[in-house]
Swiss-Prot record:
Organism listed in the record: Mus musculus
Cross-link (Glycyl lysine isopeptide (Lys-Gly) (interchain with G-Cter in ubiquitin)) at residue(s): 153
This protein's UniProt keywords: Acetylation, Isopeptide bond, Mitochondrion, Ribonucleoprotein, Ribosomal protein, Transit peptide, Ubl conjugation
Coiled coil: none
Source domain of life: Eukaryota
Listed InterPro entries: Ribosomal_bL12, Ribosomal_bL12_C, Ribosomal_bL12_C/ClpS-like, Ribosomal_bL12_oligo, Ribosomal_bL12_oligo_N_sf
Protein name: Large ribosomal subunit protein bL12m
Amino acid sequence: MLPVAASRCLWGPRLGLRGAALRLARQQMPSVCAARQLRSSSHRRSEALAGAPLDNAPKEYPPKIQQLVQDIASLTLLEISDLNELLKKTLKIQDVGLMPMGGMVPGPVSAAAPASEAAEEEDVPKQKERTHFTVRLTEAKPVDKVKLIKEIKNYVQGINLVQAKKLVESLPQEIKANVAKAEAEKIKAALEAVGGTVVLE
């Protein structure tokens, strides 16, 4: 082996500068190896991928959503109706009519068609009188509430006193649908006699 001084002479001044530059670069570089950095960043990526749900794995829902679903599932039909109505009001959702069957899209109508339709609409009310009605309770006097609840229980099939009370507390409510005119007027008179305000639709 050659002594250190001799090896420096063999390398020459250029190689000595390169060596100094390499040493300086090593001092300025972070102490972490590039290969180690690659391994750790790929490890982080694999952790992120491992945490992501797979397509065939069941989705995990937050506890807040699970509790909300359980609460909605435990509601009665009257409460669901109220929830639906309140959500429509809160979110400003308008009722949408049914789509016509067969993919028919309403389009522009000629000027002659509205005139003939108007004539038909005038004839229909003259020829046909309504025979069936929906009895709807719109208001209840607080004083006569107990009598009204008992009377509603008589006219609504399959309802108990607790359900009748909830019905009276969440007005307006439909009492009976598709009822003959005579029976609808009888129900209206009975409910108004015990303090209810009834509308026939």
